[in-house]
A protein has these predicted regions:
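Long, intrinsically disordered low-complexity tandem-repeat segments
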Residues: 12-47
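Intrinsically disordered Ser/Thr phosphorylation hotspots
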Residues: 46, 50-53, 59
Length: 578
């Protein structure tokens, strides 16, 4: 087994010696010539022999010294002395190493918000002096352009099942934006076209993945301070750390489990999970893995054994401890309340940036939004077959078409909100009942209703830029990204006050002209109808206040920067050092 070698260099002494020698030689040559020629030659010399070119790139923890050459004719001025003061890099704080383990990561594979988080959060943490490694399965569906750039790092056989059956583990590596991505390779488990198939196949697949990810870290001789696992697919990682791997190097790591959606828990037959995981019998008890007499719950076990449990918003961290939102785990979560923390997600503001978005008819920032959003509205109307009219209010809906997203409420209110001044655009796929209902509305309200029954990233960008408001009336919403993207693009969100929607959208206050959108609390179609009508009233009767809200939304910080700092503080708090 080859050990990974890390080289560290320091250029502090080099920069210092270069500065002294250059200053000395320049002073000596300048004083021998006349004043006029001295100034000319010294200026040329300083530009040509700038010591900045001699400074080597160093790791983020080492200070860089940048020195500007001073031109000395007789006595150096105060300004010249100030130029010789070394500049320091910003203090990025303590350094930690974190291994992210999850079932998907954009741009390699993505089916939902988990893929966005596994992509954007590690990149933001890398900028904060965190050494990050992301581990995901090497699915067959990963685009070939990424597969071709992966490098083989090694392979080994691993005991998996309770009977000690051996399975191949291959490691392929890809690096980008300061983050190392390691892909666990095994054709038996990951040759399907879709990351998720059914629990019969997914349970063995993710038992294997959780154990293989930790075994790969040991094989690579890369011991993280923190192992950060995500959702039920990686929830066995904390259990493996404290059982099968407790006497290995990686067993020293602290474990963090993030719940992106409590509805999905990895519940299946106890004997099946016990066999495939190979975990000891003592973890299969009612306080850990056992869901009922017959089933085991992988997420429940991860909650019990992890050092910290996070959710993707503050409100959701509280909601999941109630019977209404607890999905059968409310009592278990209340028992572990002391280690639950909510941190709101951000979005990748490089990808979602209307000022640089090449998919738009006209890019814009907060200064040009009011004008250029009209151009994008016209382009959206033309492309989707809607009546072209900049004076109409366009309301968008970008969502999976499922019960969770509040679509039964939307179906109830559509007939009431449709008029000659309003258009609705729906983008998404899901339950056939909702797909068919929206197709019916498209036929009924021709020219004013569009049902785009598919998910198309290009169309999504254009809806965010071209619509005036965006509906997110979810039954529950752990965090939600659509409302964050909507605000980034100046589309006013209309949301239900739940989970991350409540944390990120401040209700509009007509008396103070403040707020980011329109909200309603109880899950009732009448309240959604009222919220939409309040939005329409402001849009048509007080456009100045509406435009003010558009600008406020675009100026709102929805990036990962603040959230990444909270995660780093958590990592440092969990791994104190002298």
């Amino acid at each position: 087994m080859r050990k990974k070698t890390v080289q560290t260099s320091s250029t502090k002494s080099n920069a210092k010696s270069n500065t002294k020698s250059n200053a000395k030689s320049n002073t000596k040559s300048n004083t021998k010539s006349n004043a006029r020629n001295s100034v000319k030659s010294s200026v040329k010399s300083s530009a040509k022999n700038s010591p900045q070119k001699a400074v080597k790139t160093v790791a983020p923890t080492v200070e860089n010294v940048s020195v500007k050459q001073a031109v000395i004719v007789q006595k150096p001025s105060v300004e010249q002395n100030e130029q010789n003061i070394p500049t320091r890099q910003p203090d990025l704080g303590p350094r930690r190493s974190v291994a992210f383990i999850g079932s998907e990561c954009y741009p390699f594979v993505k089916t939902g918000g988990l893929g966005d988080v596994m992509s954007a959060l590690p990149k933001s943490l890398a900028k904060l002096n965190i050494d990050v490694k992301v581990i995901i399965p090497r699915y067959k569906c990963i685009p070939q352009k990424f597969q071709e750039k992966m490098e083989y790092r090694g392979s080994f056989d691993m005991n998996l099942c309770s009977d000690g059956k051996q399975y191949y583990v291959g490691i392929m590596e890809y690096q980008e934006d300061g983050v190392v991505y390691d892909f666990i390779d095994n054709d038996e488990f990951f040759s399907w076209g879709n990351p998720y198939t059914n629990l019969i196949d997914d349970i063995p697949k993710f038992c294997y993945f959780a154990k293989a990810a930790l075994a790969a870290l040991n094989y690579l001789n890369w011991t993280p301070d923190v192992v950060h696992c995500h959702d039920w697919q990686a929830a066995l990682v904390p259990l493996y750390l404290r059982t099968c791997f407790q006497d290995t190097d990686v067993g020293r790591a602290i474990s963090v489990l993030t719940i992106h959606n409590l509805k999905f828990q990895g519940i299946y037959d106890r004997k099946k999970i016990q066999y495939w995981s190979g975990l000891p019998d003592y973890v299969f008890n009612k306080d850990c893995m056992i869901q009922n007499w017959l089933d085991a719950n992988m997420l429940k076990g991860g909650i019990a054994y992890s050092n910290k449990v996070t959710t993707v918003s503050n409100t959701y961290a509280w909601e999941i401890q109630t019977e209404e939102y607890g999905e059968g785990l409310a009592e278990h979560l209340r028992y572990h309340n002391n280690k639950i923390l909510g941190i709101v997600n951000g979005i990748d503001t490089d990808i979602w940036n209307p000022a640089t978005d090449k998919l738009l008819a006209a890019d814009y920032d907060e200064k040009s939004a009011i004008k250029n959003k009209k151009i994008n509205k016209k382009a959206l109307q033309e492309s989707l077959g809607l009546d072209v009219d900049e004076h109409k209010m366009v309301i968008g809906l970008i969502s999976r078409l499922t019960n969770q997203k509040g679509l039964d409420l939307v179906n109830d209110v559509i007939p009431g909100i449709m008029d000659e001044h309003t258009q609705v655009v729906v983008l998404g796929t899901g339950d056939s009942q909702y797909e068919n209902t929206f197709r019916y509305y498209e036929n009924k309200y021709k020219g004013n209703f569009c049902a785009y029954i598919a998910y198309n990233e290009n169309v999504a960008h254009n809806i965010y830029a071209g619509c005036d408001a965006l509906l997110v009336p979810s039954r529950f919403e752990p965090c939600g990204l659509t409302q964050l993207i909507a605000m980034r693009y100046g589309a006013v969100p209309i949301v239900r006050e739940t989970g991350g929607l409540k944390d990120t959208v401040q209700p509009y206050n007509m008396f103070e002209n403040t707020g980011n959108g329109f909200t309603f609390d109880r899950y009732e179609s009448g309240l959604l109808y009222d919220a939409i009508n309040r939005a329409k009233t402001l849009y048509f009767e007080n456009r100045k206040s509406w435009d003010d809200m558009v600008i406020r939304d675009m100026n709102k910080d929805v990036s990962w920067e603040k959230s990444a700092k909270q995660y780093k503080d958590m990592y440092v708090g969990l791994t104190p050092r002298d």
